[in-house]
């Protein structure tokens, strides 16, 4: 039996704790925040609601740890079968995600986290320590007082707590203290990028009447406006969590005053304005921050068999592919598979994990960045729609050999991200050739038609 320290009790940290505990190991789970289930935190959560999309990779990872736990935490998901595009005139146009009726699922992040903490509380192999802020880690026996890796925490009372364990799992998010400390022990390549986009959370309240949903709950709603966009995902109570994404300069401009913000909404999202109501829009405007979006990559993820980074601590991505949580959950499934494969030789397993997982995580971080352009602009462009139509036809006709990129990423947990990306690149070249040749054939056909009609016309003129 190993003693495991998991830093960070977010979604990925909770799943990591449950996975190690399921293998019979003793887990200590630490988080800098108060318990999310406390009365004060529940009140804060009611002011802001962040929805996530859970798809095949995340569901498969949850089930790989505990099928009953997976059923419990996924009880309130809302299936989304495609995008619903809202144009400037208030028209709605559906775009299916999959070829065979597949779906991704909307889920409330805070509720999912609370449910996982409830499951953890019932597990005798896990002890949870909220309000413990990591300040340092010591590896490779640098601290002569201890024979194993140590983690140092500061409690809410300001006291120092030093914890010894067999290894440390860093799941403490994009601004990971574990990663920061780990860089003293490894030559870590690290890249961080803030994109030219900030976001503001809004809300569509539930409707009055027997149907609480004012728009379809089974679609991801998108108001694409090229350089900015609005999205909305359904909640179980009939409301929708909505998010405005825009360049910082534009966000600052439209948020200059209540009047400018309301005018912007009326002009650019007229149907969303009606759905939200002016008072709800102003409440979000006054109370919710304009938050940045960051993307990061690093490598390696580990130091020997003593410390390993997972989730956002290793690979933070922008939210436009809906894969942040799914990739983090998949980290845990892949890690457990490698540990079993290496018969729990932890150092060999951690090294293999870094080597095997890195290319997949780079692929999904890059795909997420690329998908912002698709969601905000391409979904309404004719070339994109033509290529998507061709992609779908080929996927249906050659279903065993041709899978669209979105389907590979969101519905096929058996296809690694990097393989999905390389396979998609080959398919894109084929689609490009088909579209080009079809266009060329069409032009030749039109030219022949005009030539024939022209000869016929001139022939009659000179009869």
UniProtKB/Swiss-Prot annotation:
> What are the GO cellular component annotations?
mitochondrial outer membrane
- Catalyzed chemical reaction(s): L-kynurenine + NADPH + O2 + H(+) = 3-hydroxy-L-kynurenine + NADP(+) + H2O
Its pathway, per UniProt, is: Cofactor biosynthesis; NAD(+) biosynthesis; quinolinate from L-kynurenine: step 1/3
Keyword annotations:
FAD, Flavoprotein, Membrane, Mitochondrion, Mitochondrion outer membrane, Monooxygenase, NADP, Oxidoreductase, Pyridine nucleotide biosynthesis
What are the names of the required cofactors?
Answer: FAD
Enzyme Commission (EC) number: 1.14.13.9
According to its UniProt entry, the protein's GO biological process terms are: 'de novo' NAD biosynthetic process from L-tryptophan; anthranilate metabolic process; kynurenine metabolic process; L-tryptophan catabolic process; quinolinate biosynthetic process
Give the UniProt subcellular location, in the record's own words.
Mitochondrion outer membrane
Superkingdom:
Eukaryota
SS bond list: none
Q: Which GO terms describe its molecular function?
A: FAD binding; kynurenine 3-monooxygenase activity
Main EC class of this protein? oxidoreductase
- Is Oxidoreductase among this UniProt entry's keywords? yes
Q: Check the record and name the InterPro entries matching this protein.
A: FAD-bd (IPR002938), FAD/NAD-bd_sf (IPR036188), Kynurenine_monooxygenase (IPR027545)
Say what the protein does: Catalyzes the hydroxylation of L-kynurenine (L-Kyn) to form 3-hydroxy-L-kynurenine (L-3OHKyn). Required for synthesis of quinolinic acid.
**Which protein family is it in?**
Belongs to the aromatic-ring hydroxylase family. KMO subfamily.
In Swiss-Prot or TrEMBL terms, this protein is called Kynurenine 3-monooxygenase
> From which source organism is this entry?
Yarrowia lipolytica (strain CLIB 122 / E 150) (Yeast)
Q: Gene name on record? A: BNA4
């Amino acid at each position: 039996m190993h003693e495991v320290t998991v830093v960070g009790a977010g979604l990925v940290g909770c799943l990591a704790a449950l996975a190690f505990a399921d293998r019979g190991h003793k887990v200590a789970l630490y988080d800098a925040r108060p318990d999310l289930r406390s009365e004060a935190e529940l009140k804060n959560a009611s002011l802001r609601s962040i929805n996530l999309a859970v798809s095949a990779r995340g569901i498969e990872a949850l089930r790989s740890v505990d099928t009953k736990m997976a059923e419990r935490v996924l009880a309130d998901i809302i299936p989304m079968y495609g995008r619903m595009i809202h144009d400037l005139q208030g028209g709605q146009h559906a775009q299916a995600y999959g070829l065979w009726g597949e779906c991704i699922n909307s889920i409330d992040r805070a509720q999912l986290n609370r449910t996982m903490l409830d499951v953890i509380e019932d597990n005798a192999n896990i002890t949870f320590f909220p309000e413990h802020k990591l300040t340092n880690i010591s590896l490779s026996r640098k601290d002569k007082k201890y024979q194993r890796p140590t983690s140092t925490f500061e409690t809410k009372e300001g006291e120092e707590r030093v914890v010894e364990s067999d290894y440390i799992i860093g799941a403490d998010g994009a601004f990971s203290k574990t990663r920061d400390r780990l860089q003293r022990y490894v030559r870590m390549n690290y890249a961080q990028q803030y994109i030219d986009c900030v976001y503001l959370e809004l809300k569509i309240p539930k409707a009055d009447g027997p149907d609480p949903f004012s728009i379809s709950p089974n679609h991801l709603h998108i108001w694409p406006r090229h350089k900015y966009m609005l999205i909305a995902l359904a909640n179980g109570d009939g409301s929708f969590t909505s998010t405005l994404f825009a360049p910082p300069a534009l966000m600052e401009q439209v948020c200059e005053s209540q009047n400018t913000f309301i005018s912007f909404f009326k002009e650019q999202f007229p149907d969303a304005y009606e759905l939200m109501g002016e008072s709800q829009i102003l409440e979000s405007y006054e109370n919710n921050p304009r938050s940045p979006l960051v993307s990061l990559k690093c490598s390696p993820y580990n130091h020997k068999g003593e410390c390993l980074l997972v989730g956002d601590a290793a690979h933070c991505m922008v939210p436009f592919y809906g894969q942040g949580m799914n990739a983090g959950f998949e980290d845990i499934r892949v890690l457990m598979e490698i540990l079993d494969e290496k018969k729990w030789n932890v150092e060999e397993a951690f090294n293999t994990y870094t080597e095997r997982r890195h290319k997949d995580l780079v692929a999904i971080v890059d795909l997420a960045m690329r998908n912002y352009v698709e969601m905000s602009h391409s979904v309404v462009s004719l070339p994109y729609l033509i290529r998507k139509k061709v992609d779908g036809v080929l996927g249906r006709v050659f279903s065993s050999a041709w899978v669209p990129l979105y389907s590979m990423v969101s519905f096929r947990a058996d296809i690694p991200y990097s393989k999905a990306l390389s396979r998609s690149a080959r398919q894109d070249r084929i689609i490009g050739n088909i579209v080009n040749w079809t266009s060329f054939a069409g032009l030749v056909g039109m030219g022949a038609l005009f030539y024939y009609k022209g000869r016929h016309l001139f022939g009659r003129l000179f009869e």
